[in-house]
């Protein structure tokens, strides 16, 4: 008994939403279809035709009678404006505020007209649309539901990338070790070369004549070899230049 007074205002509010706020006639599925303007106000198609006939609006544009917002008419036809699908569903169900469930409640087709009709006309802007998506429980066999199945996918390209990365690391380490060894050897040879003269003199004083002569003659012999190499290189260049000249 206590719920009856609460249900009556709800029913009256639902019936008010089913009426055009200009002519106060009830919407229907024929001449008075609820059309949604870009400002989200609802007007029946018959009133929109009257507004166009009065010439109050520019060509191809409808001025909202409530907020004076201009709505462009696609193809200059009122029928091209989106319908308020919520009102149409309510009219299809009898206009008593009952909810009609579609045949497939898990699917919802979203189109620009559908989204425009889903926006409540009481809001001044339509920047936000909240869509609640609920997970549907699907029937499955007991054996599959009791045993969790986890599948891991490992692409073959990942193994090849790992192998290439490992080989590249080994190659870098080997190259670095080789370069370090070459540098150490060059430094040792340079130290031995520049210290060969005092070392040879020391060996001669120590009466180690053979080694002393070898170390003492290392620097002069290397200088002589470099001079001979440079002289031979100059002679070869001159000879090649003479051969290249046309006869």
Curated annotation (Swiss-Prot):
Leading EC class: transferase
Pathway: Protein modification; protein ubiquitination
Primary location group: membrane
Gene Ontology terms: cellular component: cytoplasm; membrane
Zn finger residue spans: RING-type: 20-68
UniProt keyword list: Cytoplasm, Membrane, Metal-binding, Transferase, Transmembrane, Transmembrane helix, Ubl conjugation pathway, Zinc, Zinc-finger
Chemical reaction(s) catalysed: S-ubiquitinyl-[E2 ubiquitin-conjugating enzyme]-L-cysteine + [acceptor protein]-L-lysine = [E2 ubiquitin-conjugating enzyme]-L-cysteine + N(6)-ubiquitinyl-[acceptor protein]-L-lysine
Transmembrane region(s): 184-204, 211-231
GO terms, biological process: protein ubiquitination
SUPFAM superfamilies: RING/U-box
Subcellular location: Membrane; Cytoplasm
EC code(s) of this entry: 2.3.2.27
Membrane topology: Multi-pass membrane protein
Gene Ontology MF terms: ubiquitin-protein transferase activity; zinc ion binding
CDD domains assigned: RING-HC_RNF182
Tissues showing expression: Expressed in the cortex, hippocampus, cerebellum and spinal cord, but not in the heart, liver, kidney or skeletal muscle.
Functional description taken from the UniProt entry: E3 ubiquitin-protein ligase that mediates the ubiquitination of ATP6V0C and targets it to degradation via the ubiquitin-proteasome pathway. Also plays a role in the inhibition of TLR-triggered innate immune response by mediating 'Lys'-48-linked ubiquitination and subsequent degradation of NF-kappa-B component RELA.
Assembly description: Interacts with ATP6V0C.
Free-text comment about domains: The RING-type zinc finger domain is required for E3 ligase activity.
Protein name: E3 ubiquitin-protein ligase RNF182
């Amino acid at each position: 008994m206590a719920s009856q007074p609460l249900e009556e205002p709800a029913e009256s509010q639902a019936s008010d939403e089913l009426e055009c706020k200009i002519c106060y006639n009830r919407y229907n599925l024929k001449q008075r279809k609820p059309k949604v303007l870009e400002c989200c106000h609802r007007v029946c198609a018959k009133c929109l035709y009257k507004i166009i006939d009065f010439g109050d609006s520019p060509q191809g544009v409808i001025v909202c009678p409530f907020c004076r917002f201009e709505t462009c008419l696609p193809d200059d036809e009122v029928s091209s404006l989106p319908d308020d699908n919520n009102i149409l569903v309510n009219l299809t169900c009898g206009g008593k505020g009952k909810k009609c469930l579609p045949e497939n409640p898990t699917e919802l087709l979203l189109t620009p007209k559908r989204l425009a009709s889903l926006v409540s006309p009481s809001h001044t802007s339509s920047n936000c649309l909240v869509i609640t998506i609920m997970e549907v429980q699907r029937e499955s066999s007991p054996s599959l539901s009791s045993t969790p199945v986890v599948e891991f996918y490992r692409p073959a390209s990942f193994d090849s990338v790992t192998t290439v990365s490992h080989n590249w690391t080994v190659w870098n380490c080997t190259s670095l070790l080789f370069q370090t060894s070459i540098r150490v050897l060059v430094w040792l040879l340079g130290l031995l070369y520049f210290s060969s003269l005092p070392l040879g003199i020391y060996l001669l004083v120590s009466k180690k004549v053979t080694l002393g002569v070898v170390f003492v003659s290392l620097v002069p012999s290397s200088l002589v070899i470099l001079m001979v190499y440079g002289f031979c290189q100059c002679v070869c260049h001159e000879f090649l230049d003479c051969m290249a000249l046309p006869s």
